[in-house]
């Protein structure tokens, strides 16, 4: 029943370009008993629409966050982060902030993957190998994006005031902050 309703909503959204699909909580255990591969709305919608260009984003009055990766085990996050992935996610986020939120020149803060955003390669290499090169390319294309920020200080009062959205590398890096501020 739940998947049938979600399928119907997806089809209606695809056929009417002026609509949006807003999802809410659902009982994943019930769905997984029917579809063992179900991990969440984002992945399911991506599968149904056969789209590579998807972004999981949550927004409240206080904060907008998006995810580079979605519902994957933490052990798989580092190997999933690539320059191409970061570029794709930031471009989608930047475009959606302009079109859906009417923000002329979005300010996007990107979190690093590792503690202290890797400390210039001392704590992991993902920032140096993938994240920073992606952000430099995006800046050359005039996208207003930060260099990788340490997650433990990214959500300072100043950053919250001057940022239109944050891109986190994984699910539980940014969602707890959004939920603490907004629920």
Where are these regions (language model features)?
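Anion-binding alpha/beta catalytic cores of soluble intermediary-metabolism enzymes, centered on
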Residues: 1-183
């Amino acid at each position: 029943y739940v998947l049938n309703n979600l399928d119907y909503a997806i089809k209606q959204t695809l056929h009417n370009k002026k609509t949006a699909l807003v999802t809410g909580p659902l009982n994943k255990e019930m769905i997984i008993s029917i579809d063992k591969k179900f991990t969440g709305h984002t992945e399911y919608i991506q599968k149904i629409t056969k789209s590579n260009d998807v972004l999981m984003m949550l927004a409240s009055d206080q904060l907008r966050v998006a995810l580079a990766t979605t519902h994957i085990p933490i052990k798989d996050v580092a190997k999933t982060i690539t320059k191409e992935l970061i570029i794709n996610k930031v471009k989608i986020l930047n475009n959606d902030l302009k079109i859906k939120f009417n923000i002329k020149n979005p300010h996007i803060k990107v979190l690093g993957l590792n503690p202290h955003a890797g400390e210039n390669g001392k704590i992991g290499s993902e920032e140096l190998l993938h994240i920073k090169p992606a952000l430099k390319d995006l800046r050359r294309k005039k996208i207003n994006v930060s260099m990788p920020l340490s997650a433990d200080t990214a959500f300072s009062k100043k950053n919250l005031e001057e940022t239109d959205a944050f891109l986190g590398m994984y699910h539980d890096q940014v969602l707890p902050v959004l939920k603490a501020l907004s629920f």
